[in-house]
């Protein structure tokens, strides 16, 4: 479901732009600081309700302006254009419109506009803490299991309440009622995540093998507590330890995706270029799996395409993205860096000082 039109107003150094887009590849060419990454950032904000570069709304609103606006039109499965838009005020308030209807939720934006981001800081998926890999898993579960979003939100609220109760509870009995619901939610969340990884794993390992044929890739899901023990037993058994820590030590909030090559953690084996290629492979695999499961196409946002990738690796990624048939946005400093992707169906935009032509 590609974007056919994009309007950006008062976003970073982009005062106003209105561009028609290709359903295939869209290239943003310009020097550093020109605004090409800001276009990707605006699309990401349209699909996620937040920037991927800053958590502070005020930093992405243009100086001396009180608000920003990003509007898009995309073709739905019936080939009708559906308008979507997001308005953010400097005070942090947000308005979302879908199909002309105000008061929509950010989660609904994410549902209608699934996005995959590949950017220079994307190594954290493989090299940093489990929270990045949980987010990777949960992107997929969110798009394939309708009950997940509410269940995960409910679990996080209950976990926060439990952590507060741990500070005052005199016995486990004071927590047992809340723990019953927490345990039920945790088991469901874990089952959905495990099923997602099991279904997506074959696609991911195949694409990783294509990108990095010299390595054998293994993905393994860890649910956040002992696999042979029900979660309600873990909560009761670890009550005193949780009390001493001041928080619930085990649970789906500690889940992880363990990724190895030839039996060794990826961060101990792969170079930076190989790590980036694996991140690309995993993101493309998620998009392909989404299409297989739901019929939806996700949109790929690739910032600084040439970073860490030699010409051979760039060609591998370009060929794989073309095979998906998805819409792709690519930023690059020069046209020569994206030569492997250029064809008659794509669109080339030159970006300079926030102007897009």
From Swiss-Prot:
Transmembrane segments: none
Protein name: DNA replication and repair protein RecF
Positions that bind ATP: 30-37
Molecular function per GO: ATP binding; single-stranded DNA binding
Xref: Gene3D superfamilies: P-loop containing nucleotide triphosphate hydrolases, RecF/RecN/SMC, N-terminal domain
Localization of this protein: Cytoplasm
Lineage: Bacteria, Pseudomonadati, Pseudomonadota, Gammaproteobacteria, Vibrionales
Keyword annotations: ATP-binding, Cytoplasm, DNA damage, DNA repair, DNA replication, DNA-binding, Nucleotide-binding, SOS response
UniProt entry tagged with the keyword rRNA-binding: no
A Gene Ontology term for the protein's cellular component: cytoplasm
UniProt organism field: Vibrio campbellii (strain ATCC BAA-1116)
Signal peptide residue numbers: none
